[in-house]
C-alpha cells in the first residue's frame, strides 16, 4: 500500500459505498493513529450464522469512551501508513487470530490512540456451521495464548485485562437480573448511566471452563462410585456434579431466552414457533460450547508456541508484569501473616507520593475493583485492596533514612 492511510477488512465482509468515507473521517478531525467501526451480521445470513452472531466470542470493538477505542476488530479498521511502518506492521506469528489485538496494543504502548467511527459499519458474515464456529474459537484461544508472552501486562492469569468496555448485544452476565436505574428525586438525576460495572465475581463462574470440567468430573466420579461400596459418597459427588452442570445449562438457556430473535425469519419450512425453538436451543448450545473451544485453543497455543519470534519486540514498551503471589506467600497472608518487601533509592521518596502512585496504578490496571484508603483510625495499614469478595490485603509503607 502506498497511500497515507491503509484500510483493512476481511473476505467475509460486505461494505457500503460510504464505508471508507466514514472510516477515514477521524483522521482529518483529530491526531489519531487508527480508526475502526462496528461489524454487524447481515439479515440474509443463514439461520445458523444468525445464532453464531448471538453467541459469545465474536469480534467486537472495545471502547475507552464514545470516541476512543482500545481495540477494533481486524475486519473493519484503518491506520496511518507511517504508524504501520514505525510498528513494523503486523506480527507474522499470528496466523489465525490475535494480530489485530497485538497491533492495537503495540500502537497504544507508543502513546498513539485509535478512534471509533460508529458510522463506518460493515456487514460481517458469521460462521454458518458448528464446525466453523468451533474452529474460529479454537484459533482465538490459540491467539490469546500467543499474546500473553508478548503482552504480560495485559493479562491476569489466563484472563485478558481490558482497560476499556465492550458494548455487546449479548445478555450474558447481566441477564439473570433486572438492573434498576437511579433517576433521582422526582426524576431529577440527569443522564443516569444504564451500564453496570459491579457484576458479582461469581456471576460468570458457571460459564467458566473450570466450573464445567469440575462438574463433569464430579458427575462421572459419582456414577463410578455408585457401583462401589462408597455409594453415599457417589450420591454426593453425583449431586454436586449435576448441580454444577445444571447451573451452567440453566444460565445458557437463560442467555438464549434473553437473546433478541424476533426479527429473524423462519428456518426453511419449519413453523415459526419451531424455528424460534431451534434458534434459542442453538444459541444456548453455543454458549455452552464456546468455553471448551477457547480452552482447547489456549492449550494448543501453549503446547506449540511460535518459533523464530522473540518474546518482546523492539517496538513494544517494556512489559510491566502484574504482581503475582507465590503459594507460600499466599498461605502466609491467608492465615493472617505479613510479607515484607523493600527497595533502596538514591533520592528521598515521599511516602504519601509513593502511596498515591501505587493506588493510582492499581485503579488504572482494572485488576483491582475496590481500594479502601486509611481514614486515620487504622494505624496498621495505609490502604487495603479487595482481592476477592471476602479477602482483603492490607498495605503499610515505611520510609527509613
PLM features: residue spans?
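Acidic donor-binding loop at a coil-to-helix junction in glycosyltransferase catalytic cores
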Residues: 96-103
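Conserved nucleotide-sugar donor-binding
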Residues: 2-3, 73-87
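Conserved donor NDP-sugar-binding/catalytic core segment of glycosyltransferases
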Residues: 14, 18-49, 113, 125
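Active-site acidic Asp-centered loop
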Residues: 9-11, 91
Amino acid at each position: 500500500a502506498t497511500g497515507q492511510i491503509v484500510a483493512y477488512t476481511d473476505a467475509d465482509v460486505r461494505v457500503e459505498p460510504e464505508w471508507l468515507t466514514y472510516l477515514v473521517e477521524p483522521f482529518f478531525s483529530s491526531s489519531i493513529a487508527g480508526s475502526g467501526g462496528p461489524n454487524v451480521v447481515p439479515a440474509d445470513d443463514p439461520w445458523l450464522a444468525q445464532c453464531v452472531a448471538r453467541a459469545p466470542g465474536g469480534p467486537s470493538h472495545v471502547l475507552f469512551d464514545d470516541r476512543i477505542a482500545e481495540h477494533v476488530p481486524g475486519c473493519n479498521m484503518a491506520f496511518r501508513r507511517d504508524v504501520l511502518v514505525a510498528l513494523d506492521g503486523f506480527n507474522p506469528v499470528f496466523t489465525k487470530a490475535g494480530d489485530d489485538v497485538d497491533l492495537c496494543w503495540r500502537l497504544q504502548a507508543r502513546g498513539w490512540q485509535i478512534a471509533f467511527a460508529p458510522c463506518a459499519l460493515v456487514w460481517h458474515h458469521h460462521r454458518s456451521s458448528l464446525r466453523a464456529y468451533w474452529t474460529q474459537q479454537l484459533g482465538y484461544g490459540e491467539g490469546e495464548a500467543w499474546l500473553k508472552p508478548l503482552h504480560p501486562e495485559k493479562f491476569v492469569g489466563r484472563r485478558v485485562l481490558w482497560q476499556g468496555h465492550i458494548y455487546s448485544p449479548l445478555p450474558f452476565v447481566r441477564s439473570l437480573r433486572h438492573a434498576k436505574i437511579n433517576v433521582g428525586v422526582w426524576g431529577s438525576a440527569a443522564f443516569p448511566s444504564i451500564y453496570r460495572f459491579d457484576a458479582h465475581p461469581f456471576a460468570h463462574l458457571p460459564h467458566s471452563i473450570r466450573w464445567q470440567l469440575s462438574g463433569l468430573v464430579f458427575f462421572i466420579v459419582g456414577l463410578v462410585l455408585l457401583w462401589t461400596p462408597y455409594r453415599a459418597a457417589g450420591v454426593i459427588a453425583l449431586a454436586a456434579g449435576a448441580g454444577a452442570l445444571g447451573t451452567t445449562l440453566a444460565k445458557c438457556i437463560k442467555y438464549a431466552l434473553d437473546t433478541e430473535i424476533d426479527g429473524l425469519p423462519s428456518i426453511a419450512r419449519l413453523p415459526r414457533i419451531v424455528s424460534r425453538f431451534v434458534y434459542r436451543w442453538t444459541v444456548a448450545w453455543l454458549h455452552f460450547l464456546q468455553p471448551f473451544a477457547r480452552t482447547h485453543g489456549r492449550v494448543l497455543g501453549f503446547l506449540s508456541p511460535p518459533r523464530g519470534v522473540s518474546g518482546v519486540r523492539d517496538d513494544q514498551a517494556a512489559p510491566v508484569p502484574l504482581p503475582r503471589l507465590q503459594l507460600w506467600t499466599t498461605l502466609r497472608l491467608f492465615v493472617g501473616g505479613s510479607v515484607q518487601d523493600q527497595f533502596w533509592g538514591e533520592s528521598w521518596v515521599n511516602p504519601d507520593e509513593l502511596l498515591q502512585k501505587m493506588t493510582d496504578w492499581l485503579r488504572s490496571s482494572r485488576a483491582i475493583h475496590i481500594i479502601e484508603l486509611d481514614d486515620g483510625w487504622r494505624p496498621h495499614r495505609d490502604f487495603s485492596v479487595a482481592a476477592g469478595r471476602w479477602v482483603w490485603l492490607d498495605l503499610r509503607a515505611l520510609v527509613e533514612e
